[in-house]
Amino acid sequence: MHRLALTAQDNLAVAPMLADLAGRYPDIEDPELIRSAPVLAAKGLPPHLLAFLDDFRLREPSALCVISGLDVDQDRLGPTPEHWRDSQIGSRSLNLEIFFLLCGAALGDVFGWATQQDGRIMHDVLPIKGHEHYELGSNSLQHLSWHTEDSFHPCRGDYVALMCLKNPYEAETMVCDAGDLDWPNLDVDALFEPVFTQMPDNSHLPQNTAESTGDPTKDRLRARSFELIKSWNENPVRRAVLYGDRQNPYMALDPYHMKMDDWSERSLEAFQALCEEIEAKMQDVVLHPGDIAFIDNFRAVHGRRSFRARYDGSDRWLKRLNITRNLRGSRAWRPAPDDRVIY
């Protein structure tokens, strides 16, 4: 794990900037704030924090990077929302969200999905009543199966980032680093073949977002996206599970959303052996309030252990960002060069 602990001096140094930005922008989704984030990060974040993030980005010392020690005032934060739709109405965590955004901007460009949480850039991960046994980040009584974030999509992010605001029962985030796997004893060549069917995960389905954005143009684009999601579910795209350097490969897999019934015997055996190796090397990481985790989405899979939600305002509450190092790579999927939402 690549880890940095913020000091009291670090918190004091960034507090005036965060307060100023929180007073200047209405919410974390403000396009000008998001557009300015890389410049604001370069000017306002402590140099040693920027160097730490740059080291994680370029050297790949680990698939998991954790920044701890960000001050979180629980009284100011207020109760955990009942639903992600309620989370940004008069947000009392805007200063923390801005810090999280700036750290993410030091690694790449943040982006969102039209088919996920109403196209928001910053997501909320919290238990939702009725989702307890649903394969979704808002479940609680069952594990969230380990996966590569958005493994089905060619524009998936380089990093998925999580900022912990609350975690009273210390629910564990599961992470497996590709660097820990015993590649010489796996059938790497078979896993590099583009024969593995991967389907969209449940978070991109239309029932998990609002019926309308209020913008007819965006609604048309989003309807097209949902049709594409439907087509990928009915006719899954075949992709390789591994790519990059065959000696130390990158991964893209989500076993829960992969249809295996027509794979060759070799492909199935290679995939099952990889999954068994991942299970054996999986680590549990408990995020505490003020912890920010950056998971390398090329080099790790992640999930979450089950827990019993309370629905009393004290439940586990994380913020989430998707980050890419190649925003141009998704240009065909976005309405404009500076639009951060993939349709």
Curated annotation (Swiss-Prot):
InterPro entries: Alpha-KG_dependent_hydroxylase (IPR053447), Arginine_beta-hydroxylase (IPR023966), Clavaminate_syn-like (IPR014503), TauD-like_sf (IPR042098), TauD/TfdA-like (IPR003819). The keyword Cell division does not apply. Its EC number is 1.14.11.-, 1.14.11.41. Being totally regio- and stereoselective, this enzyme is of interest for biocatalytic purposes to produce chiral scaffolds that are of synthetic value in the preparation of more complex functionalized chiral molecules such as natural products and analogs. Keywords: Dioxygenase, Iron, Metal-binding, Oxidoreductase. Residues 199-215 have a biased composition (Polar residues). One of its GO terms (molecular function) is 2-oxoglutarate-dependent dioxygenase activity. Binds 1 Fe(2+) ion per subunit. 2-oxoglutarate binds at residue 316. It comes from Catenulispora acidiphila (strain DSM 44928 / JCM 14897 / NBRC 102108 / NRRL B-24433 / ID139908). SUPFAM superfamilies: Clavaminate synthase-like (SSF51197). Its cofactor is Fe(2+). It is an enzyme of class 1 (oxidoreductase). Belongs to the clavaminate synthase family. Residues 199-218 are annotated as: Disordered. It holds the Pfam family TauD. This is L-ornithine/L-arginine 3-hydroxylase.
